[in-house]
Amino acid sequence: MGKKDKKNNTLAQNRKAYHDYFIEETFEAGIALVGTEVKSIRGGKANLKDSYASIRNGEVFVCNMHVSPYEQGNIFNRDPLRERKLLLHKSQINTLLGYTAQQGYTLIPLSLYLKNGRVKVALGVAKGKKNYDKRDAIAAKAAKRDIDRQMKERMRY
């Protein structure tokens, strides 16, 4: 038996986070879920848009993460927007607490993915972008796309 192919196990992404924030550092965290939520997330029914994480009483919770109810879940389904606990080591929580104590920093979930059969969250320490930063990023992306297009044309001949 060979090893399984390394494939993309990303279940949900927060694309808006990279547009609205500068991501300073990322952390990997486990997430406490019930069975029907895991099935729903594996089915691609999770939405990280407008979600954030907060630290309370030495624990980290992700808020506003929408997980649609599992279709065959019946009474076992939970509230789609409930707060879910993130599983981190105490030293990691203290590091995050140090970051968020600074003015302008927040915790944003960047993606949900599978690792060894477990759902993990990529948690980013983020600082908000101003409107001119967003415009600069869009202009740089457009310039790069034009350069790549021209290079492709030149390489054909």
Curated annotation (Swiss-Prot):
Q: Name one Pfam family in it.
A: SmpB
Q: Does the keyword Cytoplasm apply?
A: yes
Q: Which keywords describe this protein according to UniProt?
A: Cytoplasm, RNA-binding
Main subcellular localisation: cytoplasm
GO biological process annotation, one example: trans-translation
- Gene Ontology MF term list: RNA binding
- What the protein does? Required for rescue of stalled ribosomes mediated by trans-translation. Binds to transfer-messenger RNA (tmRNA), required for stable association of tmRNA with ribosomes. tmRNA and SmpB together mimic tRNA shape, replacing the anticodon stem-loop with SmpB. tmRNA is encoded by the ssrA gene; the 2 termini fold to resemble tRNA(Ala) and it encodes a 'tag peptide', a short internal open reading frame. During trans-translation Ala-aminoacylated tmRNA acts like a tRNA, entering the A-site of stalled ribosomes, displacing the stalled mRNA.
User: Which named protein is this?
Assistant: SsrA-binding protein
Q: Which gene encodes it?
A: smpB
